[in-house]
Structure formats: structure tokens, C-alpha cells
């Protein structure tokens, strides 16, 4: 039997999309690893083919006991606590930092590819989003857990025995995120608000930005998966890379794209932001006190390192990617 490909966080948002992409390449010898305490996540895997499922704790034990020695070709490590508002730092560091370190060691010992999820949250409130230490200053313990693991990876560069590729995901949106609750993308929340209430609510301005004009690099999960598959096919390429479009867009842009995608499905004409505001389709609510000082009002991936590595794929704009996503949501 061929070696396994392992996907941690396999029932989660990005992990499930990676499993599906592997299936589409003919790969089914997949070990899916996750924590199904929130059982609804299983729905993300019902249209996927896998060889086995292991709980995240069981998988770590299997790895440390040597049961999988010689049996793993690659690990996509997407599993983590991704709640940026989580305040239990001890849990966050154990789950995101220590666990990742154990899997990295296993892959280096085994000569297996290790492709893992980092995060744009490592950059904090900075204005430059380049993969270098001077740009990194996380605002919360989630970002710190990702930052610290990236630092441990950097210390291994000279001695690495197999591919290590870390991906600093920016604001990812797309199918299979329905279980994420408050941490789901704004496109998902806007879609549900519009369907339920006929309008969309955004945060008022902050950090000098007008209402809804805070800007992020919103990237489709379809593009994120394509980047992961490219690195799987290029085991000679290692590094830490931003994964975003390289172009920031406003939350207003996402809201307009979402509403217009819904309107198009109903045979209605597209509207501008001004028209939506005038008709009460887009409104604003006070910026939450709990997020002040912990919120990234601006992100934009510097994709130069990704391009230098050889990846030349294009990325969907908010308008393109959101339209594709809303079409999927309307079909579900």
C-alpha cells in the first residue's frame, strides 16, 4: 500500500477542502485527524473519501509511539484553535504550538513533507506584511502561538531533512466553513444576515477608517487549496509564505458583492454601495469594545516570496470569489 497523506483539522474549513482536493487528484489513502467534540463538522467529510479517521489526541499518541513510522508521505497540518478571541493562553499554546512541534519533529525524522497553517495574525497592527521578523507583532495569544511556531521552524532551516512549508493565511472565505460560528468569514455572515433580514450589518469605522472601510486581504479557499497542492507537488520548496491575493479590499466590498450575488440569483439588478445604503440594505453597528486594540483594520499580503518560490497561479478578487461562494451557499 502507498504511504498515507495526513490532514489534521480534516473536518474543519481549510482541512476539509484539502481532503476534497486530494480526492479530486485521485488520492484516497488519507488519514483524517480532528476533534469532533463539535460533531456537526463531520458534514464536511461526507462527500470525501478517506482511509481512516483518528481523534487528534489519539493521533499524537500514535505518532509518538512509532506506529506510523515509514507510513506517512506528507502531513497537511491545518488543525488548531483558530478563535482569535480565545483567552485561555495555556490551552492555545498546547494546542497550537506544542502539538505542531511534535508533528514537525515526526516529519523531519521520517523525511515526510510538512505543510502547515500559519496565520496573517502574526503581523498584528503593522502596515507591512512581509515574512520577516521585524514585521511580526501579534495582538492576541492565537497570533502569538502561530508566531512562536514559525520561529521554531526558522531555527530548523539549516538542519531540515524534508520540506517544511508554512502558510500565513489571510482572511479566507468559502465552502465548508459553516461550523465556525463567530469565526466564520464575513461573507458567510453577510449571506445569512441578508437571507434572514434582507439587510447586512457591518462594524462602524475604527482606527481612522470610515464605516465599513476597514480593509483586509480576503482570499478564497479555492486559491488557498491550489497553493497547498502546488507545494505538495514541489517538495524541494521550503519556507514561510503569505497566502493572500496581494490586494486589500474593504468590508463594504464584501457586503456589496454578497448582496449583489444574492440579488443576481433572484433576477434583480446589481446595486452600488451608495444605493444599498440609501435603501437600507447595508447598515452599521458600533465597533465592539472587546475588539479594540486587538483588531487588524488593514491587511495586505506581500506575495513576493510566494512568487519567487515559483507559484504563478492567479487569485480571485472579492467580487469573483464571493460570487462563486454565494452560488454554492444557495445550492446547499
Swiss-Prot record:
GO-annotated biological processes: ADP-L-glycero-beta-D-manno-heptose biosynthetic process; carbohydrate metabolic process
Residues reported to bind NADP(+): 13-14, 34-35, 41, 56, 78-82, 95, 146, 172, 180
Free-text cofactor note: Binds 1 NADP(+) per subunit.
Subunit structure: Homopentamer.
PANTHER family: ADP-L-GLYCERO-D-MANNO-HEPTOSE-6-EPIMERASE, NUCLEOSIDE-DIPHOSPHATE-SUGAR EPIMERASE
Function: Catalyzes the interconversion between ADP-D-glycero-beta-D-manno-heptose and ADP-L-glycero-beta-D-manno-heptose via an epimerization at carbon 6 of the heptose.
Protein name per Swiss-Prot or TrEMBL: ADP-L-glycero-D-manno-heptose-6-epimerase
Record organism: Thiobacillus denitrificans (strain ATCC 25259 / T1)
Highest classification ranks of the organism: Bacteria, Pseudomonadati, Pseudomonadota, Betaproteobacteria, Nitrosomonadales
